[in-house]
């Protein structure tokens, strides 16, 4: 959604507020029963229950009703747009934008781009906020007590406020994110093709569904990882590579989802003449199939890295 990114960039260009007290060195979050961390966040006139995500960039994304309770108003002229995309619940929704001052419980306030959507984007919370928006030098997401024999894995991330990690497979540069809200590891078609070409996985005749938002079911083809295969030191386990509905029907005749063959660039690998790559840049979301073996995941802003404490079975 390039238009959405452009609006967010415009909002971030607003002059910064006066200097505030230094953020804490370490801030700790604990995951709930769903496997995600949550935090009360004051947004204008309301305190909202917000899921803290590991894989978004700096933005607050809200359901419509909580945004109304908070008294948010869209930015003049550019603050309301309708988008169509397979990733959107129902395939189409109205997005409203503005810059909002938020105060997460226990942390200093911060101004972030706020986006509220006419269709529900979270059914377990009022909205979603990236861990990168929390003002602390390090944020520890604690999932359980650390068992004996655990190892520490360090993953360099892209920049100070960013959450993404970049690696290379063959001639593809792949964006990698950690995602506690996904039970499996999901990727787009170009990333899946890169894993297969590198000999790390093979395609299986099975289809599953990625459900990133309520009412969204996007088909993927299962990839079987090679025994012992890893990526950035993380084991490859339950893998799904995005496919179109027509591809899903070919793989499994009973496959049904909410996406269409059009407007779904995550399912495109290479153009018909094989000379020019199409679709979105390759990306992989590392899900709970891997991250459930971690007892602690730390967003280390000061050292621009992720630190994972895990005991892989």
Where in this protein do the model-derived segments appear?
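Bacterial N-terminal signal peptides
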Residues: 5-15
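Pepsin/retropepsin-fold aspartyl endopeptidases
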Residues: 18-313
């Amino acid at each position: 959604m390039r238009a959405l990114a452009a609006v967010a960039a415009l909002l971030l260009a607003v002059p910064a507020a006066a200097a505030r007290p230094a953020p804490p060195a370490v801030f700790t979050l604990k995951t709930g029963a769903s496997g995600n961390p949550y935090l009360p966040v004051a947004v204008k006139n309301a305190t909202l229950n917000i899921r803290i995500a590991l894989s978004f960039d700096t933005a607050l994304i809200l359901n419509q009703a909580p945004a109304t309770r908070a008294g948010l108003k869209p930015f003049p002229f550019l603050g309301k747009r309708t988008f169509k995309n397979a990733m959107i619940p129902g395939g189409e929704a109205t997005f409203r934008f503005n810059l909002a001052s938020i105060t997460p419980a226990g942390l200093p306030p911060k101004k972030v781009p706020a986006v509220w959507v006419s269709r529900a984007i979270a059914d377990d919370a009022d909205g979603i906020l990236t861990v990168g928006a929390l003002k602390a030098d390090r944020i520890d997401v604690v999932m359980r007590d650390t068992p004996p024999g655990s190892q520490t894995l360090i993953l360099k991330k892209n920049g100070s406020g960013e959450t993404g990690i970049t690696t290379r497979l063959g001639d593809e540069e792949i964006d990698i994110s950690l995602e506690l809200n996904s039970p499996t590891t999901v990727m787009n078609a170009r990333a899946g093709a890169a894993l297969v070409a590198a000999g790390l996985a093979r395609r299986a005749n099975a289809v599953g569904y990625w459900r990133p938002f309520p009412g969204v079911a996007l088909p993927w083809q299962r990839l079987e990882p090679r025994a012992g295969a890893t990526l950035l030191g993380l084991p490859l386990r339950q893998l799904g590579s995005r496919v179109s509905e027509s591809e899903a029907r070919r793989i499994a005749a009973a496959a049904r989802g909410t996406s269409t063959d059009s407007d779904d660039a995550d399912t495109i690998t290479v153009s018909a003449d094989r000379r020019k790559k199409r679709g979105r840049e390759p990306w992989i979301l590392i899900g709970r199939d891997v991250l459930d073996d971690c007892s602690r995941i730390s967003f280390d802003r000061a050292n621009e890295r992720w630190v994972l404490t895990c005991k892989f079975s």
